[in-house]
C-alpha cells in the first residue's frame, strides 16, 4: 500500500510539472524527430496583459483574446530537431511592442518534428483546417476577417495560404517568410501560398536556391540580396555546421524582425530583376516622383494602395543588406559624365567622409560600365553608414586588368545624390581626372542648378 501511495505521489509531481503556470512552445528531442510525431496543434496566446506568460486557448477557451482587436497568428515550419524556433520569443516581444494585438503562436511542433520532410509537409493542410475551426469561433464572437493577420515561416507560409483559401482570400493579410520550396515548387496556386489568399500578401525570399521558393507568391515579393547567399551567413559547411543549411532560410525572419525594432528602415526597389536593380535601373519605384518606395516587413502593407493601381497588383522588389543587424544599406546615386576621347570600361569604388571624420566605403556593385564622351552613367552605390554632412569624397577607377597600362578616366562632372534623403543637397565635382587604381580624394560642392 505504501508503494501505491508513493507511486500516486510521483504521478502528481509529474503532472504538476507538465501543467506549467506559463505554457511554453513544445520542446522535443532529436529522438522524437527520428521516430516521428503525431500532429497536435496548441495555440499559445500572448497579449500586452500576458506578454511574458502564454495562455493555452482553443475553440471554447479564449483567455485574454479580445475579438475586437487585430489577431496575428505566427506559424512555424519544419522542425527536424524538435527544438523551438530560436527567433520565436523575440518576434512575440517585438510584435506586441509595436501594436496592441492578440498574438497567437501556432505550435504544431508535434507534427513538424521529424527527420522526414514529406511527413511534415503532408500535415500542413490538417493544421490549416484546425486553424480555420478556431477562427470560425472567433468570427462567431464578433471578430472580423479584416483583422486577421498570419505570419508563416517556411511551411507555415503555405499553411497560412491554405487558411486564406478557405476564406476565399478575405483574410486581412498574410506574410510569408521564405516560404518552403521543396515539394511546393511548380505547384498550382491551390497547392501553395498565392496572392489571392488574402487581401494583401507580402513575401520575403531569402533562400531561393535551396530551402525557399523562388517564384513570386504575393502581391509584393521581396528578394534581399537577390534572394540567395545572405551576407553574414557561412559560405561552407565547415564554417558553421548545420547553420550553413538554415542561415539563409532564417534570414527572412531576422529581416522582418528588424522592421519591428525600427533600428533602421529597409527600403526596397521594385524591379524586373536583381541585375537591373544592381545596375541602377529601378530607383523611382515605378511611381510618380515623391511617392515612397515599399518598406520591408511589418509596414509593407503601406504599399497596398499603390499596388492596387497595377494590373495585376503584383511586383518584385530588391534590396541589399549588411552582414549584421540593423542590416540597412544606404543608397546613393553617382552620376558621372566623362570626356575621354576613347571609350573607357570599368568599375568605380567610392568612399565618403563626414565632418567628424567618419568614413564609409562602397564598392559600386555593377557590371563593368562603358564610359563614353559626354554620356551620363548613373551608378547605384550602397553604404553601411548614412553620413549626413559629407565633407570629402574619394573615387577609384578600375578596369580589372592586372597588367598593362594604367588608364585615366576624365570626369566632366560627378554628382552624388541620396535616395533615402532626397531633400539633402546634391554634391558635385567638376573637371576631375582619375588614374586607374589610384584613390583620388576631393571636397565636393553643392551642385549648380543648371546641369548638362
Curated annotation (Swiss-Prot):
Pfam families: Lipase
InterPro entries in UniProt: AB_hydrolase_fold, Lipase, Lipase_LIPH, Lipase_N, TAG_lipase
GO biological process, one term: lipid catabolic process
Signal sequence coordinates: 1-16
Active site: 154, 178, 249
Coiled coil: none
Disulfide bonds: 233-247, 271-282, 285-293, 428-447
Alphabetical UniProt keywords: Cell membrane, Disulfide bond, Glycoprotein, Hydrolase, Lipid degradation, Lipid metabolism, Membrane, Secreted, Signal
Quaternary structure annotation from Swiss-Prot or TrEMBL: Interacts with TTMP/C3orf52.
Annotated family: Belongs to the AB hydrolase superfamily. Lipase family.
Protein name: Lipase member H
Organism taxonomic ancestry: Eukaryota, Metazoa, Chordata, Craniata, Vertebrata
Gene expressing this chain: LIPH
Amino acid at each position: 500500500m505504501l508503494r501505491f501511495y508513493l507511486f500516486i505521489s510521483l504521478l502528481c509531481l509529474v503532472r504538476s510539472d507538465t501543467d506549467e503556470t506559463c505554457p511554453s512552445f513544445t520542446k522535443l528531442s532529436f529522438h522524437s524527430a527520428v521516430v516521428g510525431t503525431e500532429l497536435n496543434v496548441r495555440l499559445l496566446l500572448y497579449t500586452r496583459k500576458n506578454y511574458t506568460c502564454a495562455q493555452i486557448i482553443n475553440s471554447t477557451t479564449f483567455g485574454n483574446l479580445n475579438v475586437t482587436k487585430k489577431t496575428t497568428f505566427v506559424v512555424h515550419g519544419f522542425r527536424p530537431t524538435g527544438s523551438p524556433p530560436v527567433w520565436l520569443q523575440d518576434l512575440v516581444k517585438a510584435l506586441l511592442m509595436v501594436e496592441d494585438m492578440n498574438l497567437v503562436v501556432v505550435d504544431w511542433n508535434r507534427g513538424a518534428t521529424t527527420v522526414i520532410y514529406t511527413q511534415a509537409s503532408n500535415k500542413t493542410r490538417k493544421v490549416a483546417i484546425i486553424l480555420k475551426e478556431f477562427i470560425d469561433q472567433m468570427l462567431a464572437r464578433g471578430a472580423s476577417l479584416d483583422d486577421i493577420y498570419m505570419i508563416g515561416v517556411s511551411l507555415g507560409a503555405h499553411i497560412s495560404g491554405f487558411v486564406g483559401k478557405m476564406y476565399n482570400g478575405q483574410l486581412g493579410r498574410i506574410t510569408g517568410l521564405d516560404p518552403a520550396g521543396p515539394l511546393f515548387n511548380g505547384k498550382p496556386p491551390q497547392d501553395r501560398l498565392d496572392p489571392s489568399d488574402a487581401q494583401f500578401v507580402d513575401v520575403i525570399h531569402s533562400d531561393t536556391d535551396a530551402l525557399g521558393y523562388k517564384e513570386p507568391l504575393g502581391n509584393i515579393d521581396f528578394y534581399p540580396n537577390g534572394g540567395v547567399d545572405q551576407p553574414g551567413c557561412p559560405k561552407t559547411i565547415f564554417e558553421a555546421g548545420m547553420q550553413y543549411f538554415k542561415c539563409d532560410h532564417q534570414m527572412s525572419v531576422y529581416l522582418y524582425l528588424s522592421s519591428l525594432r525600427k533600428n533602421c528602415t529597409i527600403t526596397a526597389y521594385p524591379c524586373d530583376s536583381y541585375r537591373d536593380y544592381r545596375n541602377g535601373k529601378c530607383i523611382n519605384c515605378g511611381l510618380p516622383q515623391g511617392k515612397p518606395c515599399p518598406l520591408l516587413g511589418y509596414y509593407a502593407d503601406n504599399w497596398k494602395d499603390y499596388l492596387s493601381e497595377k494590373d495585376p497588383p503584383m511586383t518584385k522588389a530588391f534590396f541589399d543588406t549588411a552582414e549584421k543587424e540593423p542590416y540597412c544599406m544606404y543608397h546613393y546615386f553617382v552620376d558621372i559624365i566623362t570626356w575621354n576621347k576613347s571609350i573607357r570600361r570599368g568599375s568605380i569604388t567610392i568612399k565618403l567622409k563626414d565632418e567628424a571624420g567618419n568614413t564609409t566605403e562602397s564598392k559600386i556593385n555593377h557590371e563593368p560600365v562603358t564610359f563614353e564622351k559626354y554620356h551620363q552613367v548613373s551608378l547605384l552605390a550602397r553604404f553601411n553608414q548614412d553620413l549626413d554632412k559629407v565633407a570629402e569624397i574619394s573615387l577609384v577607377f578600375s578596369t580589372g586588368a592586372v597588367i598593362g597600362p594604367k588608364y585615366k578616366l576624365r570626369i566632366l562632372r560627378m554628382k552624388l545624390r541620396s535616395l533615402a534623403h532626397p531633400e539633402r543637397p546634391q554634391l558635385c565635382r567638376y573637371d576631375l581626372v582619375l588614374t586607374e587604381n589610384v584613390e583620388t580624394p576631393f571636397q565636393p560642392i553643392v551642385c549648380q542648378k543648371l546641369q548638362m
